[in-house]
């Protein structure tokens, strides 16, 4: 990827492939001996919208929503979802058309969150984790956030600064403030180690947001170069 155009086109605007013959996946399926690649295919085969990954439990106090990036193959989410899951969290995976702009998926996600909160008054916290382009989607939720339930957002390897193509095609503007009862964590890969970003003129992760909590990831993770996709697993281990 030699230019901003190819970066945006290849990462954000290529439609994913799916196999409709595969059944809907649940976190309980992660315990099987199925390969991570195959589990990832099933994850990305989920229908657009907010997908519950497990049965609801009486003790649940938090809804935890994962939002994939552009052209994701899903495999990068398998370990993190299993690691983050607890009895107090109800895990969801948000599938959205990442080959398009983010505005409509943001509105749909907010509507679905509102519906859950209206149905279950025991929920005390909303957590979202967005990777790459998905990080832009989850931060845009904060622009008009007016719900009383506290919200915690984690963005990983996400180009929150924007790119010329994203700005012009989707009228992207980064958030300028973090609302009350909300927390934003930024988990940034090292520019030169991230194959998605390293050929750009500047690091699109580097944005100044007052009150945001920023962590730069290390060089390696379990003996692997800590680049774009491994970043989710590192955050799952360190933040949860």
Give the role of each language-model region:
Residues 72, 135, 232:
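Alpha-helical and His/Cys-centered functional microenvironments
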């Amino acid at each position: 990827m030699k230019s901003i155009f190819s970066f945006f086109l290849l990462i954000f605007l290529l439609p994913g492939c799916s196999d409709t013959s595969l059944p809907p996946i649940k976190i309980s399926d992660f315990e099987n001996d199925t390969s991570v690649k195959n589990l990832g295919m099933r994850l990305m085969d989920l229908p657009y919208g907010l997908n519950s990954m497990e049965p609801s439990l009486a003790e649940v106090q938090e809804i935890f929503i994962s939002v994939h990036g552009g052209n994701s193959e899903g495999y990068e989410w398998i370990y993190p979802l299993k690691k983050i899951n607890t009895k107090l969290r109800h895990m969801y995976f948000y599938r959205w058309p990442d080959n398009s702009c983010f505005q409509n998926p943001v509105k749909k996600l907010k509507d679905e969150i509102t519906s859950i909160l209206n149905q279950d008054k025991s929920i005390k916290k909303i957590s979202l984790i967005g990777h790459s382009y998905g990080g832009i989607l989850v931060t845009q939720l904060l622009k008009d956030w007016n719900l009383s339930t506290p919200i915690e957002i984690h963005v990983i390897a996400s180009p929150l600064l924007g790119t010329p193509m994203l700005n012009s095609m989707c009228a992207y503007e980064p958030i300028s403030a973090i609302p009350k009862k909300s927390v934003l964590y930024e988990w940034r890969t090292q520019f030169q180690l991230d194959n998605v970003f390293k050929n750009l003129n500047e690091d699109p992760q580097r944005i100044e947001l007052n009150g945001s909590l920023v962590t730069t990831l290390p060089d390696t993770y379990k003996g692997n170069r800590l680049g774009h996709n491994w970043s989710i697993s590192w955050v799952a281990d360190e933040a949860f």
